[in-house]
Each structure stands twice: as structure tokens, then as C-alpha cells.
């Protein structure tokens, strides 16, 4: 619970609505970090690797949606999380 509470405080506007795109990106980033640390300990856990790839794809789609709908919020989410942005043509 403590991790989720800290995630809620980092959300822009402290929006605790889990349907909010930014909060979904935060939660998926938290899951990615957990799976990444797990895979460092267990590099041959292929089912977890597949789950990580699916989660990364979902986060990428959410980031693309957020970029189209609200570019300012997209930039704030990237800076708060410290992740790379999407590869967008003409940018």
C-alpha cells in the first residue's frame, strides 16, 4: 500500500482516478520496475519476460494516446517518471 500511496502523490493534480491515462502510465511503470528487478535475479524466467514485453507495449500505447490528446501532460509525465518519450516524426 505504501508504494501506491506514493504513486498517488506523484500524479499530476493528485488525481487518484485509476481510469486516468496518466495514472495508468504510472502504475504500469511501477509494474515494469518490479518485473525488471525480478528478471535481474531470474534471467531465465521467460514467462515474466513475455509479461514485461506486453506491459511495455501497453504503456507505449497509453503514451501515444496521451501525446495525441494532451501534449503538456505527456511532457510532465515523462519528466516525473524519467522515461524516454516516443519516437515521433518531426520532433
Swiss-Prot record:
Keywords: Chloroplast, Plastid, Ribonucleoprotein, Ribosomal protein. GO terms for cellular component: chloroplast; ribonucleoprotein complex; ribosome. It comes from Adiantum capillus-veneris. Pfam families: Ribosomal_S15. Part of the 30S ribosomal subunit. This is Small ribosomal subunit protein uS15c. GO terms for biological process: translation. InterPro entries: Ribosomal_uS15, Ribosomal_uS15_bac-type, uS15_NS1_RNA-bd_sf. Its main location: plastid. Belongs to the universal ribosomal protein uS15 family. It is found in: Plastid, Chloroplast. The lineage of its organism: Eukaryota, Viridiplantae, Streptophyta, Embryophyta, Tracheophyta. SUPFAM superfamilies: S15/NS1 RNA-binding domain.
